[in-house]
Amino acid sequence: MHIIVVGAGIAGVCSAWYLLKAGHQVTVVEALDEVANDTSFANAGMLTPGYASPWAAPGVVKQSLKMLRAPAKPLVIKPDGSLEQIKWLWQMYGFCNATQFKRNRIHMHQLAKTTLNLLHELKQELSLDYHGLQAGTLEVFRAPADWQQCQNDTDFLNEHGIAHDLLSPQHCQQFEQGIDAQKFSGALRLNDDETGDCRLFAEQLTQHCQAAGAVFLFQHAVTELWLEGQTVRGVKVGEQTLAADHVVLSAGCYTQKLLQTVGIQVPIYPIKGYSMTVPIVDEAKAPQSTVLDYQYKVAITRMGKHIRVGGIAELSGWQRDKHPHNLDTLKQVLNDLFPDCADLDAAELWMGMRPATPDG
């Protein structure tokens, strides 16, 4: 069968590869001029089944109010007056209970674990090199109360066999010698978590897709799905129609917009995330893997000779404007935990729109 994949981010490229392996003819249609150039471009690079957990959780409303008042805000909500935003937030509130949280956390963990296993198979099969590291994740807790709560809340990790350790700040320096142990009360180490450069992975897998016969159409923005009766028969790119037996939507947030063209409503909302990428200037002071700051919800990830610092959850609608002040938060966290390890003046700021559902 001929299958069109809409979107050439990490989800689209991986979908194309597995469809090719199943014997299908594949065309990938992408609005931008290269693969992984939007949401997959510069994310935090975390491969963390142990950390996979819904945002919609008990107590998140109270936490959110504290975050909104913080000087360095990990959460930004800018009301846009739309019913869509209000409805999405209300739906998320409905998932912030213990029953829904536990169920969704199990699903997310299982999905993340399966995904990581498939990534290992691809890496071995195709000899992919994407700055991958298997050095675990370290989540640091600044406030003593947060650290105590972490120590009391390891049941899920134990029940699901997630290898972990509870570490003192000094013990953390065995894994991250450059970290400032004076800045936090304790840390949770998830031993089997990994890191990698999402964009680099997608670029290399694209080459294998093309070698296997996939066609990539860049600068082809899909405007709507093409219906024949009640069946999707392809996509429309402006005035042009591209026919296919099936269509796979992997267009991030814009999947929601495309489904609306055939009368289907899904609760996907764009949540902006920010990252900065900085060159390392002192190897001894630089992070070795991923370090998560619980208080600021920021991830610091080693990527070759650079460090990627990602975080911020900004709900401000579909506008793609960047807010440079968010860079200050990312710089503050990096310099606080790993002082003088990188050239902050050379920081490259990026913003991507996470496709988020209200269940977290």
Where are these regions (language model features)?
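N-terminal Rossmann-like FAD-binding beta1-loop-alpha1 element of flavoenzymes
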Residues: H2-V28
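Glycine-rich FAD pyrophosphate-binding loop
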Residues: K21-F41
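Active-site substrate-recognition segment that forms the wall
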Residues: N43-M46, Y51, W55-F95, V222-G234, ...
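Helical element adjacent to the flavin cofactor pocket in flavoenzyme catalytic cores
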Residues: Q148-H160, I179-H246
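Dinucleotide-binding Rossmann-like beta1-alpha1 core, especially the glycine-rich loop
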Residues: A44-P169
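Short loop/edge segments at beta-strand edges and connector loops
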Residues: E30, S168, F218-H220, A347-W350
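Conserved Rossmann-like nucleotide-cofactor binding loop
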Residues: A11, E34, Y254
